[in-house]
């Protein structure tokens, strides 16, 4: 201090010659003098420079000169003055010749420089914006505690009278230090001009004082707010820049790319050297090197480079915590020595009790700081890895997309990323428990001598068993993840293709397939869990075996006596060893899971990407008349391993040209556009595009946003141009009818729009782009005749908005070819011919063959004109005045309702009030605590008998544990005769028997919880799947797919793993708490007085915490659903995103969604630490109470009983803290059960099968269909979409159904298949009302070929014969009939060929023919074709028509068509208008009437 006391007497620093009064002190006066003088300066000079360097690089602006800062500076300068005066006095005395020890000059000088450094730190902190300093807080605390203790002992020894001036100076300095310490507990004002931008709701951590940060009291405001009212997202704090995705992902991506490049160079060098040294063996080594060196290692290294500082800081906190952890056994040894010796004064026992309390508190604070740092690291790593996965999704090549379905990607971000980040908490568990074990053995050696060596043998003998178990668990874990992927992929396909499944009545078959995979998944999970239980019990048994063997050897072999100090200090050390041995299997278990997930992530991140060098592109555009697109001798393949799909393409397209691409199904039309986009792998050749590119895919992709955001697609809003685009794309009337106009949300996957509206919206997005090159993949296929003609004339054609731009149009509409500047005919992946329309007609080559196929055979008399003769000028007439007026009249003559209201729009109205609970893009959120019914639902799923059995087993093993500890206390109190205990063998034998019984009960109880959890998982998943699959089609149209996928992936994983794990831990710790409370109450009854208030405080903390934590968990789940939905949406539209060069805006959107999810996760993270820190601090009070009560009752208690009580009290802090945490975690996890039950009460479809109905096989025999005054509405509050429809279709009759968009054509098919139930009237088939027939019975007797052909992930045979009702011969015959036999025979595996999700590896025409083959195999009496030929070329359409005429000649056929050409062969045509049958008759009769059908034929160019 400024005025140090006299130096130590005697030799050295430590005084060994204290007088008798001081000898009774636990700490010598010389130690206090030395520590008080040197420890605070050493502390500041060691940490101060590091702290200065840190704040120099992490400044946050600067602080104003506040009153708090001024007070600190005044006190600091006052301390400097006092230290200076002490130095001056010492120098003056030396100058006067007064004999003084050197310490009287050295000590004040050291304190003077240290105080000056402290003042400098205070000033620097203000400059760098530090509001509260932990380093100075610790310094002022040390400056007060150690010198104050020294001064107090000197004062009690009459040292004050020896030099009153120096001691007055000391007390004055102590007073100033106390004032500085108090000020250091306060936080200064926020920084002025901070480097981070101002946030709307900043996290209070940055402005909290150091004590508040250490105890996490800055979280209390949020917890209290959550207790008073439900928390909302706006109540949560903003996310700091250091935690933002933009910052984290960019850093990780940069390091990863750098490491990958270095690894590739290294591997190439090694491969080159090995090739030179071993000849042909080099290629064998390269895959190994590529797998081991260039995949997982660079990513792991990058993660370490980015996040190592946070991890090391947390590890340092953990090491300091462990120092205090091992201080407790030493203090306990001294305490039991004090209890056993009646001579020492009572204050010594109280001092030891205080020291144990302080050590436990410091252990708590540092341990919670470690957990906080690692949790923050976990959150940051999650953001970074999710960002990497998202960026990879945007860069996947076509071959990689086939290998990774949407469900796989969702599984990666929802499960694998979570498991990988959770492993951060257990990384130190691989080495730190080993250090604990070594330290424990050192303690045991000190206590028991050579007998402790036997513990090493027992422990090491069990290690091979655990390594073997870990290896087996790894195998089963990988199997479970494989099955999880298969289930996720199939479940995703079911949810996305629910309409197709319901069309065919396949729900039951898909349920069986999913549940079969689920059964294998749970089987692997059960086996893995049982192995984990064996591992955990083996570690528990190893602890007991160590104690048993050590005690037995110590007492029986070495013939030593047991006493309380040996028994219970050993027991305390073994409890630490128990934690180490429990932590180790948890760490191994977590890291085994993380390794599997990490390998899967690395495999995905290393998939093949789109090569940006395939196309030589320029955004500047080309001059008029110059070539805009050039392809020279180019050959393309879908991936580097697959055979070429386009051969020797040579093509030059000048700027402003309209190029039409035609050809049969599978000719390579869409592949050509993909090649121009750079989506294909270029085998050879050259490709160049000048100017910005816009792309319209064949299958429209839209975002889950508003109409205007879909059209603008990240560009600035230009209202006049937007209006022109919407009008040209025939969207303006639709938009006008939407409830919020252009700001109306269209729902996920455009579920509020029809297929035609989605296609026009996709086209409008491209047109709005004002690009130089437009790649249009059959955009007119999903549009009816008049809308398609309008769109072509107004947008694509020579007089449209895109005139002057380069347009490559893939089309099957041959009647528009005369207006194209140039035509390419593709066949078998090569250009068959190209030229102008007239040139190709004159050649009479491939184009003429297509026109001949498209020309209808026979003399029908409809007056259909050949496309070549529809206009005199192949380019000019559409741009003239007269055709423009005719088109305008044709559009305006249609009533507004017909033009704007699609059937899908009618099905799911955008202004539906019921949709308020299901907004697009937002998940449902419950508020308040989880209801008891949810807990009961889970327990019922487990089974009441199994629940009671598990509780009984836990009780039995805990009774055995109590008896074992009590028996040890009796053993310790046995008197020794001749240095030995006569009953040692009996005591040891019963001790061992009780331990074995406890181990058996522990394994049985954990196995019971595990098996019960697996049973509950199976039932809850089965109910969720059943509830979703049994829902009507409207449920899928209004529920975002991401919300469903989240429940089938993340929530299911929580129910599978987290709930059984938390339940097992809760029961273990709850019964352990009962044991500890009983021990303390029996041994030291006075401690009961402290136990009851502590329990009340614990209950208060839990009540405050649980409500907020559960609500935060719900908000977190809902926010993460948005991340999954956006990830899935981007995966499906990545080609469009790349084509428009909008990767950066999409990455920004993903960053915003992930940041929002993390903004909600962070409060839950720190709330956990708030609970743990404060609950453990309260629990440490029980240690103090038990020790204090033991001192008070020292005369009445045996040493063994006191040891039993205090050692148990030392465990109550961790035990009670884990009870609260596991209960809270269990309630947080049980939210997943609540979310899985969200759809249990939604409306369901009619029964699939009815036990008694008239529709028994062979119904229907004839296929007669009769609509009687049929009416249909899609919602109860909506008007009828179809009304008053009455007609009869005779058995075997082929009837066409036509009409404008929204006329009600597809509604008739929906009513016939009962996708929507009749609102009035009904439908009869062969005289049987379909309302009296089960849904599956009805749908299995009707075949439908929908507009969008869907294939499911799985074999081709499964897609054709899902119910396995047909032989291979029958399937091959059906394929031959649809002319796909040769194609399938060429595929790898043939019928066992694995189809990609939604059949993306096949063309639309090929998929349509496969659907036709599927209908051939079903052999039903009724067939519905719902726009089945809209997306196929005329040749394929004629092929399908011919098969309908031959194979379905005896069937009743309903042909819903856009192309009137398709219905000209029908015996009768129904013309729908405004939901009613407007006209009915043969095509010739309807044309002669010159009514609505005639006008439609005019618009189609047929008359």
Swiss-Prot record:
Changing residue 698 to P: In PXE; does not change protein biosynthesis and folding. Changing residue 355 to R: In GACI2 and PXE. Changing residue 1268 to Q: Associated with lower plasma triglycerides and higher plasma HDL cholesterol. Residues 881-901 have a biased composition (Basic and acidic residues). Residues 1-31, 94-98, 150-167, 324-349, 448-450, 555-575, 961-997, 1083, 1197-1198 are extracellular. Residues 53-72, 120-131, 189-302, 371-426, 472-533, 597-939, 1019-1061, 1105-1175, 1220-1503 are cytoplasmic. Glycans are attached at residue 15. Changing residue 709 to G: Found in patient with putative diagnosis of PEX; uncertain significance; loss-of-function mutation; localization comparable to wild-type. Changing residue 810 to M: In PXE; protein level is 15-20% that of the WT proteins; maturation of glycan chains is not affected indicating normal trafficking from the endoplasmic reticulum to the cell membrane. PROSITE patterns: ABC_TM1F, ABC_TRANSPORTER_1, ABC_TRANSPORTER_2. It comes from Homo sapiens (Human). This is ATP-binding cassette sub-family C member 6. GO terms for cellular component: basal plasma membrane; basolateral plasma membrane; endoplasmic reticulum membrane; extracellular region; membrane; nucleoplasm; plasma membrane. Its cofactor is Mg(2+). It is found in: Basal cell membrane. Changing residue 463 to H: In PXE; uncertain significance. Gene3D superfamilies: ABC transporter type 1, transmembrane domain, P-loop containing nucleotide triphosphate hydrolases. ATP 1 binds at residues 663-670. Residues 311-593, 947-1228 form the ABC transmembrane type-1 domain. Residues 854-919 are annotated as: Disordered. The keyword Transport applies. The chain crosses the membrane at residues 32-52, 73-93, 99-119, 132-149, 168-188, 303-323, 350-370, 427-447, 451-471, 534-554, 576-596, 940-960, 998-1018, 1062-1082, 1084-1104, 1176-1196, 1199-1219.
């Amino acid at each position: 201090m400024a005025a140090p006391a006299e130096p130590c007497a005697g030799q050295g620093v430590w005084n060994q010659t204290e007088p008798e009064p001081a000898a009774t002190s636990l700490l010598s006066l010389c130690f206090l003098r030395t520590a008080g003088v040197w420890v605070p300066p050493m502390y500041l000079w060691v940490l101060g420079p590091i702290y200065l360097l840190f704040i120099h690089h992490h400044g946050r602006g600067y602080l104003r000169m506040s009153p708090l800062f001024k007070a600190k500076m005044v006190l600091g300068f006052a301390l400097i003055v006092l230290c200076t005066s002490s130095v001056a006095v010492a120098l003056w005395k030396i100058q006067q010749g007064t004999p003084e020890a050197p310490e009287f000059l050295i000590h004040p000088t050291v304190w003077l420089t240290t105080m000056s450094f402290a003042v400098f730190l205070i000033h620097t902190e203000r400059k760098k914006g530090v509001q509260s300093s932990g380093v100075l807080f610790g310094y002022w605390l040390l400056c007060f505690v150690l010198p104050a203790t020294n001064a107090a002992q000197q004062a009690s020894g009459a040292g004050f009278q020896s030099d009153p001036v120096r001691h007055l100076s000391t007390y004055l300095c102590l007073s100033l230090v106390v004032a500085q310490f108090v000020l250091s507990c306060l936080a200064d004002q926020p920084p002025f001009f901070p480097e981070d931008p101002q946030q709307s709701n900043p996290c209070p951590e940055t402005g909290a004082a150091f004590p508040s940060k250490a105890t996490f009291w800055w979280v209390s405001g949020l917890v209290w707010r959550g207790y008073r009212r439900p928390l909302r997202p706006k109540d949560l704090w903003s996310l700091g820049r250091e935690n933002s995705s933009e910052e984290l992902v960019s850093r990780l991506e940069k390091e990863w790319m750098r490491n990958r490049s270095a690894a590739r160079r290294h591997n190439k060098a090694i491969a080159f050297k090995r090739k030179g040294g071993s000849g042909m063996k080099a290629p064998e080594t390269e895959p190994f090197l590529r797998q081991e060196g260039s995949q997982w290692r660079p990513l792991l290294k990058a993660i370490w480079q980015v996040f190592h500082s946070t991890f090391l800081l947390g590890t340092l906190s953990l090491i300091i915590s462990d120092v205090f952890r091992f201080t407790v056994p030493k203090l306990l040894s001294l305490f039991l020595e004090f209890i056993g010796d009646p001579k020492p004064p009572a204050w010594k026992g109280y001092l030891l009790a205080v020291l144990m309390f302080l050590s436990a508190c410091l252990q708590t604070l540092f341990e919670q700081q470690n957990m906080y740092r690692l949790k923050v690291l976990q959150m940051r790593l999650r953001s970074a890895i999710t960002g990497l996965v998202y960026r990879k999704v945007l860069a996947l090549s076509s071959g990689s997309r086939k290998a990774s379905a949407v469900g796989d990607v969702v599984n990666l971000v929802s499960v694998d990323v979570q498991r990988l980040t959770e492993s951060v908490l257990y990384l130190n568990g691989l080495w730190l428990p080993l250090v604990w074990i070594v330290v424990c053995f050192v303690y045991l050696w000190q206590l028991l001598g050579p007998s402790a060596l036997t513990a090493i043998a027992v422990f090491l003998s069990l290690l091979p068993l655990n390594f073997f178990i870990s290896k087996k668990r790894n195998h089963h874990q990988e199997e479970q993840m494989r099955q999880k992927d298969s289930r996720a992929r199939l479940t995703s396909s079911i949810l996305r293709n629910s309409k197709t499944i319901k069309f065919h009545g396949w729900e039951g078959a898909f349920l069986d397939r999913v549940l079969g995979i689920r059964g294998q998944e749970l089987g692997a999970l059960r086996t893995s869990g049982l192995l984990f239980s064996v591992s955990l019990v083996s570690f528990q048994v190893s602890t007991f075996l160590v104690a048993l063997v050590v005690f037995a050897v110590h007492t029986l072999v070495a013939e030593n006596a047991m006493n309380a100090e040996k028994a219970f200090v050993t027991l305390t050390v073994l409890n630490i060893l128990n934690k180490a041995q429990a932590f180790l299997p948890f760490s191994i278990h977590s890291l085994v899971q993380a390794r599997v997930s990490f390998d899967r992530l690395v495999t995905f991140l290393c998939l093949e990407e789109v090569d940006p060098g395939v196309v030589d592109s320029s955004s500047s555009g080309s001059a008029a008349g110059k070539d805009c697109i050039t392809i020279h001798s180019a050959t393309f393949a879908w991936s580097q391993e697959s055979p070429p799909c386009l051969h020797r393409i040579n093509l030059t397209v000048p700027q402003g040209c309209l190029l039409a691409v035609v050809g049969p199904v599978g000719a390579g039309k869409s592949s050509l556009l993909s090649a121009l986009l750079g989506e294909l792998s270029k085998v050879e050749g050259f490709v160049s595009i000048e100017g910005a590119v816009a792309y319209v895919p064949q299958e429209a992709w839209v975002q889950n946003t508003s109409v205007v955001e879909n059209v603008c697609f990240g560009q600035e809003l230009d209202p006049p141009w937007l209006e022109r685009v919407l009008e040209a794309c025939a969207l303006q009337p639709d938009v006008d009818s939407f409830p919020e106009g252009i700001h109306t949300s269209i729902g996920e996957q455009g579920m509020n729009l029809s297929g035609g509206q989605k296609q026009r919206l996709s086209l409008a997005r491209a047109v709005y782009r004002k690009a130089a090159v437009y790649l249009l993949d059959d955009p007119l296929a999903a549009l009816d005749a008049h809308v398609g003609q309008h769109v072509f004339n107004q947008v694509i054609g020579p007089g449209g908005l895109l005139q002057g731009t380069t347009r490559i149009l893939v089309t099957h509409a041959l009647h528009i070819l005369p207006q194209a500047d140039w035509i390419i005919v593709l066949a078998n992946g090569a250009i068959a011919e190209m030229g102008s329309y007239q040139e190709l007609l004159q050649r009479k080559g491939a184009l003429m063959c297509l026109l001949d196929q498209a020309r209808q055979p026979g003399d029908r008399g409809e007056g259909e004109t050949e496309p070549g003769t529809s206009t005199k000028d192949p380019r000019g007439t559409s741009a003239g005045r007269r055709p423009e007026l005719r088109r305008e009249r044709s559009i305006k003559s249609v009533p507004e309702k017909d033009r704007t209201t699609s059937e899908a729009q009618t099905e799911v109205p955008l202004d539906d009030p019921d949709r308020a609970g299901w907004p697009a893009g937002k998940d449902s959120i419950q508020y308040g605590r989880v209801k008891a019914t949810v807990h009961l639902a889970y327990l019922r799923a487990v089974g009441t008998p199994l629940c009671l059995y598990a509780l009984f087993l836990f009780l039995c093993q805990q009774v055995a544990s109590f008896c074992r500890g009590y028996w040890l206390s009796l053993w310790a109190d046995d008197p020794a005769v001749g240095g030995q205990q006569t009953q040692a063998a009996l005591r040891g034998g019963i001790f061992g028997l009780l331990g074995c019984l406890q181990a058996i009960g522990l394994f049985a109880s954990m196995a019971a919880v595990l098996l019960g959890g697996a049973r509950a998982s199976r039932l809850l998943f089965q109910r969720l799947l059943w509830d979703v699959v049994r829902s009507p089609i409207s449920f899928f149209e209004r529920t975002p797919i991401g919300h469903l996928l989240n429940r089938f992936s993340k929530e299911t994983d929580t129910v599978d793993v987290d709930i059984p794990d938390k339940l097992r831990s809760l029961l273990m710790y709850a019964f352990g708490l009962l044991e500890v409370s009983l021990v303390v109450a029996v041994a030291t009854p006075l401690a009961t007085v402290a136990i009851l208030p502590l329990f009340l405080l614990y209950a208060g903390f839990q009540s405050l915490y649980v409500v907020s934590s559960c609500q935060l968990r719900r908000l977190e789940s809902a926010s993460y659903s948005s991340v999954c939905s956006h990830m899935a949406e981007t995966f499906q539209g990545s080609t469009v995103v790349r084509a428009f060069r909008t990767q950066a805006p999409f990455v920004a959107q993903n960053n915003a969604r992930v940041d929002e999810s993390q903004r909600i996760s962070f409060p839950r993270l720190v709330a956990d630490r708030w609970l743990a820190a404060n609950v453990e601090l309260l629990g440490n009070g029980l240690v103090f109470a038990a020790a204090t009560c033991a001192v008070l009752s020292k005369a009445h208690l045996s040493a063994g009983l006191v040891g039993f009580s205090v050692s148990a009290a030392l465990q109550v802090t961790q035990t009670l803290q884990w009870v609260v945490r596991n209960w809270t975690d269990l309630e947080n996890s049980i939210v997943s059960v609540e979310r899985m039950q969200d759809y249990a009460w939604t409306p369901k479809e009619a029964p699939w099968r009815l036990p008694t109905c008239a529709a028994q096989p062979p119904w229907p025999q004839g296929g007669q269909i009769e609509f009687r005054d049929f009416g249909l509405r899609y919602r109860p509050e909506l008007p009828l979409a179809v009304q008053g429809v009455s007609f009869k279709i005779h058995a075997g009759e082929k009837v066409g159904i036509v009409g404008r968009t929204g006329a009600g054509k597809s509604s008739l098919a929906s009513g016939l298949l009962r996708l929507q139930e009749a609102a009035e009237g009904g439908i009869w088939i062969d005289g049987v009302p379909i309302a009296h027939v089960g849904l599956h019975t009805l749908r299995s007797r009707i075949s439908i070929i929908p507009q969008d052909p869907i294939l499911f992930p799985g074999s081709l045979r499964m897609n054709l014969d899902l119910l396995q009702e047909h032989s291979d011969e029958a399937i091959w015959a059906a394929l031959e009939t649809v002319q796909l036999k040769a194609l399938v025979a060429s595929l790898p595996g043939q019928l066992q060929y694995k189809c990609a999700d939604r059949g993306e590896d096949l063309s639309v025409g090929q998929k349509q023919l496969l659907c036709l083959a599927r209908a051939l195999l079903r052999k039903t009496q009724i067939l519905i074709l719902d726009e089945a030929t809209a997306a196929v070329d005329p040749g394929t359409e004629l092929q399908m028509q011919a098969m309908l005429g031959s194979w379905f000649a005896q069937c009743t056929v309903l042909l819903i068509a856009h192309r009137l050409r398709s219905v000209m062969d029908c015996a009768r045509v129904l013309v729908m208008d405004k939901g009613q049958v407007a006209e009915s008759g043969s095509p010739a009769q309807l044309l002669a009437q010159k009514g609505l059908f005639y006008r439609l034929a005019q618009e189609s160019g047929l008359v």
